From Swiss-Prot:
Catalyzes the oxidation of malonate semialdehyde (MSA) and methylmalonate semialdehyde (MMSA) into acetyl-CoA and propanoyl-CoA, respectively. Is involved in a myo-inositol catabolic pathway. Bicarbonate, and not CO2, is the end-product of the enzymatic reaction. It is an enzyme of class 1 (oxidoreductase). Keywords: NAD, Oxidoreductase. It comes from Bacillus cereus (strain ATCC 14579 / DSM 31 / CCUG 7414 / JCM 2152 / NBRC 15305 / NCIMB 9373 / NCTC 2599 / NRRL B-3711). The active site is at 286 (nucleophile). The keyword Oxidoreductase applies. This is Malonate-semialdehyde dehydrogenase. Pathway: Polyol metabolism; myo-inositol degradation into acetyl-CoA; acetyl-CoA from myo-inositol: step 7/7. InterPro entries: Ald_DH/histidinol_DH (IPR016161), Ald_DH_C (IPR016163), Ald_DH_CS_CYS (IPR016160), Ald_DH_N (IPR016162), Aldehyde_DH_dom (IPR015590), MeMal-semiAld_DH (IPR010061), MSDH_GmP_bac (IPR023510). Homotetramer. It catalyses: 3-oxopropanoate + NAD(+) + CoA + H2O = hydrogencarbonate + acetyl-CoA + NADH + H(+); 2-methyl-3-oxopropanoate + NAD(+) + CoA + H2O = propanoyl-CoA + hydrogencarbonate + NADH + H(+). Its EC number is 1.2.1.27. Belongs to the aldehyde dehydrogenase family. IolA subfamily.
Length: 486
């Protein structure tokens, strides 16, 4: 339930809401107004240790619960999420800032991840081959690995946690969740509904906080695996630190997603697709389109239509259904983004749509409007870096080959899209682009939860990705059994 009271956020350990043992707190503002809506604890190491102890104790019994029974609990959780999806979307808009339309879409994608987790009995099945030698059978069995942890970002406070703990718990593990201190309220509600579904205490534990919680998770000897989603520098740190302490780690990192626009594209649908990918959720998503490589033959026409349509977008509070671009998450991030826009101008790019100039009526929130640069090249910071904002760079290329070459020069390789009506162009793009997730006339090629989600190069650190069969393999260990009976 959303109230006007300033909330003091708690941890959830061993089935109970508890105050952090630390004294440090951080204010949580509504990004659309700047007004404080909550205070979140910056929990110390001791809180993480208590959560791990609770999860470790719960694992002894939870791991022995029959797999179908674990799924039945998740079906109850799924039902509760569906019944409360309007409230969940409003909490996301309140603390994250994205429009209610975007938040509602996120809720649905989170629910889809839980739907995947309910199918765990099928996904966990092993393999068997009889008579591999005379009288000898071979088989592979999958078992839970123990206490696992998830560290999640602010930009998808529902979807990304639901990628992690439902699947891990369905596999028989217990979980310690550390969500972003910038969006703690949705995490609280997810945990409340989880225990309403009837799960035993200690199966899921929530520890709020910042870097101290992250380090405590990475160094704790009883945590067997860590799932992470966030920026590239932090993902690299999480992967290196976690593996150094003997853990499995999957760390999904940053992006600089390119879209190649071919002369044979459907112009109207391509423009709307690029706008949706670049500017929805205020560009604060790792699958946002941040660079368009447009072929010279169609460049002027495409850019004219894109600019005209982008200038129609309204900026403001996400609860106003007329607004398309909500606020950025914090004032500090807004200042960082403005710095990138200024650097693009200083480096000689042409600013076609200036997101610094927005209507004063939007108020005191952390707003930057949709921004478009033309004449961008690979030497500019606005091409190189993940800005994580509604800032789109346009690079003109002579043909598909040059567009692919440009895209592959980025240090990131998360997602990439081509807009074309030519099957050969699509095939060439698919086979030669370096990206983990590829779209052909699909604006945001984020796969459904039953497929793996991960990029390449500096967009992903690890071996097994999140979601799908990769997720099940990450959260389980296999035993290969060779047996003979006399």
């Amino acid at each position: 339930m959303i109230t006007t009271e300033i909330k003091r956020v708690k941890n959830h350990i061993n089935g109970e809401w508890v105050e952090s043992t630390g004294t440090e707190v951080e204010a949580v503002p509504n990004p659309a107004t700047g007004k404080i809506i909550a205070y979140v604890p910056l929990s110390p190491k001791e809180d993480v240790e208590k959560a791990v102890e609770a999860a470790k104790a719960a694992f002894e019994t939870w791991s022995k619960v029959p797999v179908p029974n674990r799924s039945r609990n998740l079906y109850k959780y799924l039902q509760l999420l569906q019944e409360n999806k309007d409230e969940l979307a409003k909490i996301i808009t309140l603390e994250n800032g994205k429009t209610l339309t975007d938040a509602t879409g996120e809720v649905q994608r989170g629910i889809e991840a839980v739907e995947l987790a309910t199918s765990t009995p099928n996904l966990m099945m092993g393999q068997a081959l009889p008579n591999i030698a005379s009288g000898i059978d071979g088989s592979i069995w999958r078992y839970p690995i123990g206490v696992v942890a998830g560290i999640t970002p602010f930009n998808f406070p529902m979807m990304i946690p639901l990628w992690m703990f439902p699947l891990a718990i369905a596999c028989g593990n217990t979980f310690v969740l550390k969500t972003s201190e910038r969006t703690p309220l949705l995490a609280e509600r997810l945990v409340e509904l989880f225990y309403e579904a009837g799960f035993p205490k200690g199966v899921l534990n929530l520890v709020q906080g910042g870097k101290d919680v992250v380090n405590s998770i990475l160094e704790n000897k009883d945590i067997q695996a860590v799932s992470f989603v966030g920026s590239e520098p932090v993902a690299r740190y999480v992967y290196e630190t976690g593996t150094k302490h003997g853990k499995r780690v999957q760390a999904l990192a940053g992006a600089k997603n390119h879209a190649i626009v071919m002369p044979d594209c459907n112009l109207e649908k391509t423009v709307q697709g690029v706008i949706g990918s670049a500017f929805a959720s205020s560009g604060e998503r790792c699958m946002a389109c941040s660079v368009v490589a447009v072929v010279d033959e169609i460049a002027d026409e495409f850019i004219d239509v894109l600019v005209a349509e982008t200038k129609k977008l309204k900026v403001g509070d996400g609860f106003n259904e007329d607004n398309y671009v909500g606020p950025l998450i914090r004032e500090s991030h807004k200042e960082r983004v403005l710095g990138y826009i200024n650097s693009g101008v200083a480096d000689g790019a042409t600013l076609l749509v200036d997101g610094r100039k927005i209507n004063e009526e939007v108020g005191e929130g952390y707003f930057v409007g949709a921004t478009i640069f033309d004449g961008v090249n690979q030497e500019m910071k606005i091409w190189q870096d993940e800005i994580f904002a509604p800032v789109l760079s346009i690079v003109r290329v002579k043909d598909l080959e040059e567009g692919i070459k440009l895209t592959n020069q980025s240090k990131f390789a998360n997602g990439a899209v081509i807009y074309t009506s030519n099957g050969k162009h699509a095939q060439t793009f698919r086979d030669n682009i370096d990206a983990g997730m590829i779209g052909v006339n699909v604006n945001v090629p984020a796969p459904m939860a039953f497929f793996a989600f991960a990029g390449n190069k500096a967009s992903f650190f690890g071996d097994l990705s999140t979601n799908g069969t990769d997720g099940v393999q990450f959260y389980t260990r296999k035993k290969v059994v060779t047996e003979r009976w006399f």
